[in-house]
Amino acid sequence: MAWRIARSAIAACAVLSGLMPAAAQSVEEFYAGRTVTLIISFGAGGLNDIAGRLVAQHLPRFIPGRPRIIVQNMPGAGGLVAANHLYNAAPQDGSVLVQLDRSVAQSGIRGAANVKFDPLKFTWLGSLSNYDNEAYLLWVNVSHPARTVADINRLATPTRLGAVSGGTNMLMSLTAKETLGLNVKVIRGYVSGPAVWLAMDRAEVDGQTIGFTSVMAEHPEKWENKEIRPLLQFGRATRLSLFSELPTARELAPTPEARALVEFAELPFLTSLPYVAPPNLPPDRTRPLQAAFIKMSRDEAFIADARKRRVELSPSDGDQIMAVLRRSAAMPKKVIEQFNAILEAQN
């Protein structure tokens, strides 16, 4: 009888150990020899892709076990496709990470269509830029007649701005139109940033909204050869010194209500190029990943490589990202509803 009880106990222990392999593994054991997938939520060629591949190259050195990281591009709906995939379909063990568009988390907070995740439950590792040394700009081709942002409203025909559906450039272009009252027409439906650049080259559109770092990483020759002209700054409370002659969107907001909408729209810039792991990741795996991201962002080799690829760095950690998301979620309901109305009116 005692032998049968002992044998049953041994069998039960074997079953339980088979059900809980992760609990018996250290972080180093989990990642050693493993291939981690980093999903980039946009197509190849743009700043998101450039920065994502930079992180995939350097981050393994700082993760215990030094896993290999491969890149997978998963564009769609301004980053929502990748976010929904990570939250609902990807392995939840830390073997899949995602670089999201900065606007995706706020899309979840404001209850945008097709959102199937709670951004506050993602495991935020950090972001590469808080926009301290950056500006998001409204650009036009140099052949366009507008020399200043005020000129846009003096023209008989709207200035056509190309945009990726659901992306930051769509959100900022609509903010310029509906909140600042600029005479622009937002041409959506482009699948990627490179497609918008091509549309500008072909004169299908007159311009777009895009960050200065993106311009310098993707098409520095357009700035250096004066092929494009900046007219307006987004993402900043004050003017970036490089563009001291250009007004900020907040300066042009005609009413306190409009300024509140602009400030809400600009909050995601504080968490640009963010990286996330799945929700409910165990703390013993979360902390090493978050620490690895920050160590990487301070590493001399990483910084030098980022400079070479023209990726502007002003990193934030996961806690700082969560603070921005909570700030966004705490905005007055009326502001969020007004912002949603601006976007929904264009659908």
Annotate each predicted stretch with a short phrase.
Residues 43-44, 278-282:
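Structural beta->alpha junctions
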Residues 1-4:
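N-terminal secretory signal peptides that target proteins for export/translocation
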Residues 272-278:
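A short beta-strand structural signal in non-transmembrane regions
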Residues 20-24:
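Sec/Tat signal peptide C-region and signal peptidase I cleavage site
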Residues 32-36, 225-226, 252, 260, ...:
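An extracytoplasmic/periplasmic, membrane-proximal ligand-sensing/linker region
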Residues 8-18:
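Bacterial N-terminal signal peptides
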Residues 25-272, 337, 344:
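Conserved hydrophobic/amphipathic secondary-structure segments
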Residues 10, 55, 172-173, 289, ...:
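Generic structural signal for hydrophobic residues
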